[in-house]
């Protein structure tokens, strides 16, 4: 039996907005507070960052569990997603900019300036590691899923060069070039639904039941309306995702894949400072056994960047969508890691 999960429009969360200073960007985030009878004061605050293509609801199985520990939980729709602004320019999506945006969400909820715990998945993990680099004073612990920390690089390389070295990430080129965006944004809601089903493990009906998403290639945009339902996402939740993605289309989420050179340029000064950098907070990285693009061995040697220790875990039976695929195992590991802060 799956653990308790948030539903779309769940009364346990409240909806909040913040306009980031010096920008025209508005973020939407969910805020959940623990039961005041059991926890008159939250034990700590957790910021959860989702990945691609997801929403704040991607953490639906974790939020009730975190509330049961007395934690206050903040879950933004990331830039380009849901009810958050979706600017057209890729430059708005740099990890440096996004880190700055997160500081304002943290400070709006936590005006005392107390550091928060950080939970991340996929692109949210890429961002989370950079947030902790740029603003270490705001973070007191990190648990990340599927994306290990990698230090800033001293050389700017293109996405094409990166994919030459890592062909298992070929889908990123398809995303960056706009092929999927053009097909989905210019099509029906059924095409959008097919794309989302493909991302969440749906099968290509006319291709012998193979996965509709291939990390080496991406998706066959001509067959999106033929993709079967996701085995991981209920019809109710998928309906919600389709409505949320219908609002602004998928250019915003795809823009995250157009920022490689922007991010590397931003991080050149960090690369010099971070040669011997170590995070000064406890951290945990959780990898999975069924994600061909992100194998567990990517964490090899990662320990040297963590002065307070790094816990490394693998959930062998899980796919990339570990938060919803194996929520019991996720919550168990998160609960064990967070005990030191409670």
Curated annotation (Swiss-Prot):
Q: Which organism is it from?
A: Neurospora crassa (strain ATCC 24698 / 74-OR23-1A / CBS 708.71 / DSM 1257 / FGSC 987)
Indicate the annotated site residue(s) for Contributes to the formation of an oxyanion binding site for the epoxide oxygen of substrate.
171, 257
Name the encoding gene, please: srdG
Recorded hits in SUPFAM superfamilies, A to Z, give: alpha/beta-Hydrolases
- Please identify the protein, giving its name as recorded: Epoxide hydrolase srdG
User: Which superkingdom is the protein from?
Assistant: Eukaryota
| Active-site residues annotated for this sequence | 122, 320
Task: Show the GO MF annotations.
Answer: hydrolase activity
Write out the similarity annotation: Belongs to the AB hydrolase superfamily. Epoxide hydrolase family.
Q: Please report what switches on or represses expression of this protein.
A: Expression is up-regulated during sexual development. Expression is also up-regulated during confrontation with the arthropod fungivore Drosophila melanogaster.
What are the annotated disulfide bridges? none
Q: What is the lineage of its organism?
A: Eukaryota, Fungi, Dikarya, Ascomycota, Pezizomycotina
What does this protein do, in the record's words?
Answer: Highly reducing polyketide synthase; part of the gene cluster that mediates the biosynthesis of sordarial, a salicylic aldehyde structurally related to the phytotoxin pyriculol. The most interesting aspect of this pathway is formation of an aromatic product from the highly reducing polyketide synthase srdA. SrdA synthesizes a reduced polyketide chain from one molecule of acetyl-CoA and five molecules of malonyl-CoA. The polyketide chain is then reductively released as an aldehyde.
Which EC class does it fall in?
hydrolase
């Amino acid at each position: 039996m799956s653990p308790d999960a948030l539903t779309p429009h769940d009364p346990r969360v409240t909806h909040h907005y913040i306009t980031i200073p010096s920008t025209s960007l508005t973020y939407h985030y969910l805020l959940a507070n623990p039961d005041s009878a059991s926890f008159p004061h939250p034990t700590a605050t957790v910021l959860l960052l989702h990945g691609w293509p997801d929403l704040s609801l991607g953490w639906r199985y974790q939020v009730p569990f975190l509330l049961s520990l007395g934690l206050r939980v903040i879950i933004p729709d990331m830039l380009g997603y849901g009810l958050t602004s979706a600017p057209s320019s890729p430059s708005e999506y740099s990890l440096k900019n996004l880190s700055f945006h997160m500081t304002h969400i943290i400070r709006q909820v936590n005006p005392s300036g107390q550091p928060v715990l950080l939970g991340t998945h996929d692109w949210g993990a890429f961002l989370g590691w950079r947030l902790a680099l740029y603003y270490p004073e705001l973070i007191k612990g990190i648990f990340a899923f599927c994306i290990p920390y990698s230090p800033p690089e001293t050389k700017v390389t293109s996405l094409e060069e990166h994919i030459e070295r890592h062909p298992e990430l070929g889908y990123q080129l398809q995303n960056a070039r706009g092929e999927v965006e053009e097909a989905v944004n210019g099509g029906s809601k059924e095409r959008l639904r097919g794309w989302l089903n493909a991302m969440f493990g749906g099968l290509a009906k006319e291709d012998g039941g193979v996965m509709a998403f291939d990390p080496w290639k991406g998706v066959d945009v001509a067959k999106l309306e033929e993709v079967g339902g996701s085995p991981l996402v209920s019809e109710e939740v998928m309906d919600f995702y389709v409505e949320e993605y219908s609002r602004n289309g998928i250019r915003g989420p795809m823009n995250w894949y157009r920022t490689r050179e922007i991010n590397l340029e931003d991080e050149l000064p960090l690369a010099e400072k971070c040669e011997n950098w170590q995070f000064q907070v406890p951290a945990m990285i959780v990898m999975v056994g069924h994600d061909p693009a992100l194998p567990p061995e990517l964490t090899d040697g990662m320990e040297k960047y963590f002065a307070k220790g790094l816990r490394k875990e693998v959930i062998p039976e899980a796919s990339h969508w570990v938060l919803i695929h194996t929520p019991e195992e996720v919550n168990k590991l998160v609960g064990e890691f967070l005990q030191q802060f409670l």
